[in-house]
């Protein structure tokens, strides 16, 4: 029998503990968990000991001057966009030249005859990024694009497109990318978070909205899938009184699992609030007065369906609320106007009496009228609270302060092997 071939000896590992060298035609297979995409898995030919990668053009295109950091989440509406906004500002404050992009667009609007991603537009504007630091979204994830892909009408090779569009950014120190809503979203187009991270050789930071101690399970699962690409996590929306307990339980546990906890962000009512203008849009409401105060922020919802004495006690316990009540419940409307109310939403499309409108004008409280019943109105408002965005200037200031106080930017820079003293070009 012949002597078995000598096993291939892997090259010396990359010096960075978080970003191993991407595979090339001379390097062995590099695996980041069980979810590495087919394009980067090597084929082992029969009777050969060495591996021959089938996807080699990536490493040739990677610009050496910019690294990639992908911000993702374990579930939608975890605070990913807010984290991106706050983090990018901290990076700029450290003197780093940052580029930004969102490969999969979900919040699209039409501007000047073309579709733009609203999050990209807003964050780029907040950071004063020049055009060459903004990478357009590749794909709008909506019903139409999904149908086209499922019917086979869209045969685009998004992996190739991702390389061509995102790996040509040779300027700046860091390309900060906002990932999909969870680890699976985008898989239909080969653009899930693990796939994107693998293709562009990106480090990953995940944002997780805290719900209970069992929130660690989704992070452990993500670690299994992403492996060493996952360089850290941010635990968001934690009740302030529970943060000390998390520092003694979840933080050390995750660190033992080689998951760096870069920040534990306290729950903040302002960041979970919605503007009156957003409620007008979602409810298709008519504004009866104070259309100039639609920028007021609503932090809670109250339903005026009880007697007036109970309503007064109920309203006094709440702050910055939207009150939903029937257009014929004048006594409830009056009680709401004398408490911490940001807007009054009247159902049934019944107009309020003139003295209610006059008092609302004096107190600068918008009154909205909707052609809906109370239950449907409450459901829409609740859903709006569950899909909060950070497109108001007051929220930008808030998230910057939260991140500056509760996020370990120095540790992130160390994990990325970036120097805060780097000079801008």
Regions inferred by a protein language model and the residue ranges of each:
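N-terminal phosphate/diphosphate-binding loop that engages ATP/GTP or pyrophosphate donors
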Residues: 72-78, 82-156, 165-166
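Conserved catalytic-core segment of NTP-binding enzymes
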Residues: 180-259, 328-390
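Short, C-terminally biased terminal segments at protein or domain edges
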Residues: 1-59
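Flexible, charged surface loops at secondary-structure boundaries
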Residues: 63, 168-171, 312-321, 336-340
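Phosphate-binding/switch loop-helix module in NTP-utilizing enzymes
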Residues: 147-189, 194-198
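Non-catalytic interface/targeting segments
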Residues: 164, 259, 264-326, 382-425
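Structural motif
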Residues: 68-69, 97-99, 121, 173-175, ...
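Extreme N-terminal, non-catalytic leader segments
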Residues: 39, 55-73, 77-78, 92
